Amino acid sequence: MASFGVRGMGQPLGIRICCCRVCTCINFGFVLSRIGLLKLMQLGLAMLCEGLLIRYGVPYADSIGQALTSFLATTGHCFTTTGILLLCYAFSDKSYSLIRQSLFETLFNGLASCMYFSSSSYMGFACVVWLHPQFLVRPGFWAYPAMTACYYMGYAAGILHALDAYLAFRHFRGAR
């Protein structure tokens, strides 16, 4: 049975299979840590939002308007940057110690939180004003429930990024 190695004193990284270790370049200790799980949740919410926006929002872009563009830009930006950070942190302890203590993490997560709250509010307005009346009269109009779920998940992603900004700021200030 494979056991996941975590970074500890004298314990190597990777997956232990029988008498050898494979994938020693991956730091599973980070991926399963509090910050790693927070990054994974941010990625998951961004991926779900992006999928819903493309599948159900793009066909009704005329009805939704700029709220769709705003939300797509927010999820795309946050998904890409969070994914790159997660990859860097999972493959390099040095990257984690250098980037996490810099001001970049705090500013990125603070900006991402503001962008998610802003675009979610705009999407909520678009849902109530333009999509809900169509949902009441057109059977099988799935854009309204999908976009509603999207802006709810956007608020959740904004909260996660705000929490990550707070934790990054504490790390920046020296509290580990």
UniProtKB/Swiss-Prot annotation:
Inducing or repressing factors: By Mef2 during myoblast fusion in developing muscles of embryos and pupae.
Membrane topology term: Multi-pass membrane protein
Gene disruption phenotype: RNAi-mediated knockdown in pupae is adult lethal. Pupae develop to the pharate adult stage and die before eclosion from the pupal case. In pupae, fusion-competent myoblasts (FCMs) fail to fuse with the muscle founder templates. Pharate adults display adherent muscle formation; only partially developed dorsal longitudinal muscles appear to be present but they are smaller and their nuclei are reduced in number and clustered together. RNAi-mediated knockdown in embryos reduces myoblast fusion.
Segments crossing the lipid bilayer: 13-35, 71-91, 111-131, 140-160
Domain MARVEL: residue ranges: 30-173
Major place of residence: membrane
BP GO annotations: adult somatic muscle development; muscle organ development; myoblast fusion
Pfam families listed in its UniProt record: MARVEL
Compartment(s): Membrane
Keyword terms, alphabetized: Membrane, Myogenesis, Transmembrane, Transmembrane helix
Cellular-component GO terms for this entry: membrane
Misc note: Named 'singles bar' based upon the accumulation of single myoblasts in mutant embryos.
Known function: Essential for myoblast fusion in developing embryos and pupae, and consequently is essential for muscle formation in adults. Required for progression past the pre-fusion complex stage of myoblast fusion.
Protein name: Protein singles bar
